[in-house]
């Protein structure tokens, strides 16, 4: 009987494990990045955060069991004025508890409404999440901020001082705002910025960017014919992924760094490609090994007219050959 009981218990445990939902983190570097964006209804999965921070967040979610985390109530008494003040305090829209951030000041700098940024948003170590908070401007960020997410807000402009002196910033994600204007020095002086995501906005002119970038997504904006400066990406020697889909571009922004692995330009107005766009016409043995993912589908270009333009590539571009 004891053996049967242990077998039954083992089967119950295995069944519970198999029934548990899996968690997939959003991967910026995926080869099917665009497909993931189409299939993903929310952007609340984060990556490149130290494992212990992610684990802390998951633990606090299990403990809270509630998406809305209210600020602590008054310690003594039940004075009505104190209750009213408590009700007027913004809620943290996140499942994680606000741990003590690694910044000067417990809750970081204050916004224009005199709320601490880490109370209005959610700070986990050096990562700041301000997603879906109806913000109309970049909040003042703690000086040690490394990753900043402010997606699905109403931000219209990025000022040159919004990220000033934030020398540790590695990622900025401002997906799905109303951004139409960016000051020229908004990003250029950030010494360690690696990933910049500005997709789904109204940007008409891309400012000068730091050469440290490895990942750029400016898809679904309004860059048009003149929105990208000449040789904008030339000196980005570590740039791996460049996404400029749905922008009414009529040309491929050249030159592109040798480090580039993925170039997505679908759904633009590109009409032609030159033989030296990707290859070296003076060196017929040249092979561009890194660039394996080129998307030109949704453009009026006929790729069959310039076969020499991609003879050096490991894979044919995706697009029309008719």
Swiss-Prot record:
Disulfide bonds join 118-130, 279-312. Residues 58-108 are annotated as: Disordered. It holds the Pfam family LRRNT. Residues 106-143 form the LRRNT domain. This is Epiphycan. LRR repeats lie at residues 144-165, 168-189, 192-213, 238-258, 259-280, 290-310. Gene3D superfamilies: Ribonuclease Inhibitor. It is found in: Secreted, Extracellular space, Extracellular matrix. SUPFAM superfamilies: L domain-like. The gene is Epyc. Confined to the middle zone of embryonic epiphyseal cartilage consisting of flattened chondrocytes and the ossifying region in the limb buds of chick embryos. Has also been detected in testis. Keywords: Disulfide bond, Extracellular matrix, Glycoprotein, Leucine-rich repeat, Proteoglycan, Repeat, Secreted, Signal. One of its GO terms (cellular component) is extracellular region. May have a role in bone formation and also in establishing the ordered structure of cartilage through matrix organization. Glycans are attached at residues 64, 96, 283, 302. Residues 1-19 form the signal peptide. Belongs to the small leucine-rich proteoglycan (SLRP) family. SLRP class III subfamily. PROSITE patterns: LRR (PS51450). One of its GO terms (biological process) is sensory perception of sound. The O-linked polysaccharide on Ser-96 is probably the mucin type linked to GalNAc. There is one glycosaminoglycan chain, known to be dermatan sulfate, and it is probably the O-glycosylation at Ser-64.
């Amino acid at each position: 009987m004891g053996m049967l009981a242990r077998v039954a218990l083992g089967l119950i445990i295995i069944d519970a494990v198999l029934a548990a939902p899996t968690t997939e983190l959003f991967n910026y570097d995926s080869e099917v990045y665009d497909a993931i964006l189409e299939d993903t209804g929310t952007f609340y999965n984060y990556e490149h955060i130290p494992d212990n921070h992610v684990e802390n967040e998951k633990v606090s979610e299990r403990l809270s069991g509630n998406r809305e985390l209210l600020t602590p109530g008054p310690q003594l008494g039940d004075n009505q004025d104190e209750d009213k003040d408590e009700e007027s305090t913004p809620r943290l829209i996140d499942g994680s508890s606000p741990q003590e951030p690694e910044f000067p000041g417990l809750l970081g700098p204050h916004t224009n409404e005199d709320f601490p940024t880490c109370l209005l948003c959610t700070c986990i170590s050096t990562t700041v999440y301000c997603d879906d908070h109806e913000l109309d401007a970049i909040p003042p960020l703690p000086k040690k901020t490394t990753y900043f997410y402010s997606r699905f807000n109403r931000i219209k402009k990025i000022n040159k001082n919004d990220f000033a002196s934030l020398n540790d910033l590695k990622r900025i994600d401002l997906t799905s705002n109303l951004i139409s204007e960016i000051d020229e020095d908004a990003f250029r002086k950030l010494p360690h910025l690696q990933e910049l995501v500005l997709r789904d906005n109204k940007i008409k002119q891309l400012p000068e960017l730091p050469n440290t970038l490895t990942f750029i997504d400016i898809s679904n904006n309004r860059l048009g014919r003149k929105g990208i400066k000449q040789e904008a990406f030339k000196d980005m020697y570590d740039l791996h992924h460049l996404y400029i889909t749905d922008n009414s571009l009529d040309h491929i922004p050249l030159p592109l760094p040798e480090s580039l692995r993925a170039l997505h330009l679908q759904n633009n107005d590109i009409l032609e490609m030159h033989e030296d766009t990707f290859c070296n016409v003076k060196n017929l043995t040249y092979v561009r090994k890194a660039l394996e993912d080129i998307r030109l589908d949704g453009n009026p270009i006929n790729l069959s007219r310039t076969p020499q333009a991609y003879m050096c590539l490991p894979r044919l571009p995706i697009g029309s050959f008719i």
